[in-house]
UniProtKB/Swiss-Prot annotation:
GO BP term, pick one: poly(A)+ mRNA export from nucleus
Protein name, UniProt field: Uncharacterized protein C12orf50
Comp. bias intervals (Polar residues): 350-359
Source organism (scientific name): Homo sapiens (Human)
InterPro entries xrefs: DUF5571, Znf-CCCH_3
Cleavable signal peptide: none
Pfam families named among the record's database cross-references: DUF5571, zf-CCCH_3
Region annotated Disordered, chain positions: 136-168, 297-333, 346-414
Biased composition (Basic and acidic residues): 399-414
């Protein structure tokens, strides 16, 4: 059957430029073919007769591919599952109607009616009565908020120039909590917190609810600071421990919080102001300058004492360079370290008895003939002995208590 059907179909490769190259090609060929020297005539007359009759089978073939498409589209257009579901639902409804006919008695009807009434009443209680409650609560909250916002909107309690920002609008719960805390407990001012540079940051909000006028508190603070600054200038040299609290720099934010605490405590208990002394920044500068003058060693009567105080600095430099020199020396490390240890012990002894250190500086100048070291301002007088060093470059002076060890000279080490 396939042979006869394929003979009625023209070959596709004839339309191509090379033509059909297959010798045993089953399809119909209207042109002769030459395949590798083999001549093949066109198809026979039997195929032509079949070709005339191609109209009927072609129509049947054109209808054949449409049939499977219709079969595929049928379940989409006619779903059987929905029909079965509808039928089942109808059957269930019929069964319910039949059961209702059997069970409908006056007692059961009353029970169903009572159940429906109970459900309706419960729905009214839980659903229909809640919106009025919500509306009433909403109508009450704005009035309460307006009453609480009135003292804040006046602006008399707000302080200008302060880095603290007071919120103008708060929720009802926060306002009630703050009012309770301000009424039940007094605001606490800790003196130790002021000494450590801190303060109670929540005090300004409590000041507002207590009704304290902060403009008056600021004027009182200015008067207190002026009086206390005059007292501290008079009592600079007094060794009282309370004045030492005012000689320490405090950050500006902590000073603001602490001054607010002081103003609050001054309103409550004026006697407590004797413990804390607020000081402005210019007074801190004077205290800092006085401390610097005290630390500088400029008031010594003798220049020898000044040299004795600053003498350990060149000694540390010379010992550092000497240790580096001894590390680089070969085959003589142990002897050099032992010699340096004995020498440092001998040189530290006269430094306690004699503050001028005349021989001490000479010993260092002889021991280190390096010209690249920059001399300090305290040892410049003893370090300018260049002529004496040129005469005896390797001479060394030893004290009485110092031991003299023979120095081995190896590989050009001095």
């Amino acid at each position: 059957m396939e042979m006869q059907q394929n003979c009625s179909i023209s070959c596709f490769w004839e339309t191509q430029p090379l033509g059909c190259v297959k010798i045993s090609c089953i399809f119909y060929h209207s042109k002769p073919r030459n395949i590798n020297g083999l001549f093949l005539p066109p198809s026979s007359n039997i195929t032509l007769q079949k070709e005339i009759q191609e109209g009927i089978p072609l129509q049947s073939q054109s209808q054949e591919p449409l049939k499977p498409q219709e079969n595929i589209s049928r379940p989409i257009h006619h779903p059987l599952v929905l029909k079965t579901n509808f039928e089942e639902e109808e059957e269930v409804d019929e069964q319910n109607d039949a059961s209702s006919l059997w069970t409908k008695t006056p007692e059961e009807i009353e029970e169903k009616r009572a159940i429906k009434e109970m459900c309706y009443k419960s729905g009214e209680y839980y659903r229909f009565h809640t919106p009025p409650d919500i509306l009433s609560s909403k109508s009450m909250t704005p009035t309460a908020e307006k009453q609480l916002e009135k003292p804040l909107e006046n602006g008399s309690e707000l302080q200008e120039g302060d880095s603290l920002t007071v919120p103008t609008k708060l929720s009802q719960y926060e306002r009630q909590g703050e009012i309770k805390t301000s009424l039940h407990g007094k605001p606490k001012t800790d003196i130790a917190a002021f000494e450590n540079g801190g303060g109670d940051c929540y005090v300004p909000q409590r000041v507002i609810f207590l009704g304290v006028d902060e403009s008056e508190a600021l004027t009182e603070e200015k008067e207190i600071t002026i009086s206390k600054c005059s007292n501290t200038k008079d009592n600079k040299d007094s060794p009282h421990p309370k004045h030492s609290l005012t000689t320490r720099l405090v950050p500006t934010t902590h000073v603001l919080n602490a001054t607010e605490n002081i103003s609050m405590k001054c309103r409550e208990d004026p006697s407590s102001m004797n413990d804390v002394q607020p000081v402005k920044k210019p007074h801190f500068k004077g205290v800092k300058k006085r401390k610097w003058i005290y630390d500088e060693p400029q008031n010594f009567p003798n220049s020898g004492m000044q040299r004795a105080v600053q003498a350990p600095r060149p000694q540390n430099k010379m010992s550092y360079h000497r240790n580096n020199k001894n590390r680089n020396a070969e085959n003589a490390s142990y002897i050099h370290v032992q010699r340096d240890a004995v020498r440092t012990v001998a040189l530290n002894a006269p430094s306690r008895s004699r503050p001028t250190h005349g021989s001490y500086n000479k010993v260092h100048a002889n021991r280190e003939p390096k010209p690249n070291l920059s001399p300090d301002k305290y040892t410049s007088t003893s370090y300018n002995d260049s002529a004496w060093r040129k005469r005896i470059p390797f001479s060394k002076t030893y004290s009485k208590s110092e031991k003299i060890y023979p120095e081995p000279r190896r590989n050009g080490s001095k």
